[in-house]
C-alpha cells in the first residue's frame, strides 16, 4: 500500500511513499551478503558487488530511520537545526550512511529543508524525499507536486538514472552527461541511490566508472527509481556500521566498496557537505496482554 506524503500547504499532489518492508531480503540475480548486525531480529543491511566496479548496499526501512544532515558549506544557504550540530543525535544508533548530491551551483535541481525552499524544485528531476519520521523515497518530481507538513528534506540531483526499473544511461554517454568530471574524463568516482518496488533503499558507489555501470547495477538490484548522487575523487562514500561494543564508544564502520576516498569515521561528525544517515529505529513495544476474562 502506498501512502501520499506530499500535499498540504501548496496544493494537491501525487508524490507517494512506499510502506516499509516487512522483514524482507534482497532479490534478483546478485549474490547479497548479509551483514551480521540485527535490529529486532531483522538484518537491516546487505551488501554485494556488480561487475568489477560497483559496490551496493541494501537497506531495510522497516527498522531504519533516515535523515539528511546538512554540511557546513553545502547545500549552500541551507537551514540548520540545532540537532544537526550534535552527532550524539545520530551516531549512537548509526547503522549506515552515504553521501548526498552535488553543490547546488553545479546542479539544476532544487532543495528544501526544515520548512524552507532554498532552491525551487524542477520538473522531471530525480528527487530524494525524507520525512520527519525517518521515511525515505526517490521519485521523479512533477510540476504539480507539493510539500506536506511531514516532509523534512527534499534534495534534487540531476535527471533520473533509473525510471520504472529501466536504466536511462548509455555506455557511450558524454563525460558531462551525468555531471562534470575531473579532467573531463568519462571515468570518475560516482554514486547513486534508488528504491525498489517494495521500499528498500539501495545505494551504489564505484571508482573510475561511468554512470551506466551504476544504472546496470541498480537495475540488477531491482530498483524502480534511482538518482545520481555526488561524484569525483573524494565525495562518493558509503558505509555501514557495527554497533559499539561498549556504551559511549563509537560504531565501527565498513566501506561499501574499495576505492572510497574517505574513512567511515568522517560521517560520525557534521562535515562540509550533506550526508544521509540511517539510524536504528527504537524497538516496537510488545502489546499489553489482554486482561483475564
Residue ranges and their predicted role:
Residues 37-42, 108-112, 171-179, 257-259:
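Short Pro/Gly-enriched beta-strand edge/turn motifs at strand-loop
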Residues 1-4:
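Positively charged n-region of N-terminal signal peptides that target proteins for export
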Residues 22-120:
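Zymogen propeptides
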Residues 8-19:
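Bacterial N-terminal signal peptides
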Residues 155-184, 190:
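Histidine/lysine/aspartate-rich catalytic loop segments that bind and position anionic ligands
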Residues 106-109, 138-139, 147, 171, ...:
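Extracytoplasmic/secreted cell-surface and envelope-processing proteins
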Residues 98-168:
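Active-site-adjacent helix-turn-beta-strand microarchitecture at beta-sheet edges
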Residues 163-164, 182-287:
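Extended C-terminal subregions enriched in glycine
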Amino acid at each position: 500500500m502506498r501512502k501520499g506524503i506530499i500535499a498540504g500547504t501548496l496544493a494537491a499532489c501525487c508524490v507517494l511513499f512506499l510502506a516499509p518492508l516487512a522483514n524482507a531480503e534482497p532479490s534478483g540475480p546478485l549474490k547479497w551478503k548479509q551483514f551480521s548486525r540485527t535490529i529486532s531480529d531483522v538484518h537491516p543491511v546487505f551488501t554485494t558487488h556488480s561487475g568489477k566496479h560497483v559496490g551496493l548496499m541494501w537497506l531495510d526501512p522497516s527498522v531504519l530511520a533516515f535523515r539528511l544532515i546538512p554540511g557546513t558549506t553545502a547545500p549552500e544557504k541551507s537551514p540548520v537545526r540545532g540537532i544537526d550540530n550534535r552527532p550524539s543525535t545520530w551516531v549512537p544508533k548509526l547503522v549506515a550512511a552515504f553521501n548526498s548530491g552535488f553543490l547546488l551551483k553545479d546542479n539544476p535541481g532544487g532543495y528544501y529543508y526544515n520548512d524552507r525552499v532554498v532552491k525551487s524544485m524542477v520538473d522531471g528531476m530525480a528527487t530524494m524525499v525524507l520525512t520527519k519520521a525517518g521515511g525515505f523515497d526517490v521519485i521523479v518530481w512533477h510540476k504539480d507536486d507539493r510539500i506536506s507538513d511531514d516532509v523534512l528534506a527534499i534534495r534534487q540531483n540531476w535527471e533520473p538514472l533509473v525510471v520504472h526499473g529501466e536504466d536511462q544511461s548509455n555506455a557511450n554517454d558524454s563525460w558531462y552527461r551525468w555531471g562534470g568530471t575531473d579532467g573531463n574524463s568519462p571515468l570518475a568516482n560516482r554514486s547513486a541511490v534508488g528504491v525498489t518496488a517494495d521500499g528498500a533503499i539501495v545505494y551504489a558507489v564505484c571508482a573510475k566508472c561511468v554512470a551506466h555501470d551504476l544504472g546496470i547495477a541498480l537495475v540488477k538490484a531491482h530498483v524502480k527509481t534511482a538518482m545520481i548522487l555526488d561524484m569525483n575523487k573524494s565525495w562518493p562514500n558509503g558505509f555501514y556500521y557495527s554497533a559499539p561494543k561498549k556504551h559511549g564508544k563509537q560504531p565501527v564502520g565498513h566501506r561499501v566498496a574499495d576505492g572510497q576516498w574517505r574513512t567511515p569515521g568522517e560521517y560520525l561528525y557534521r562535515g562540509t557537505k550533506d550526508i544521509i544517515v540511517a539510524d536504528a529505529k527504537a524497538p516496537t513495544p510488545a502489546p499489553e496482554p489482554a486482561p483475564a476474562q
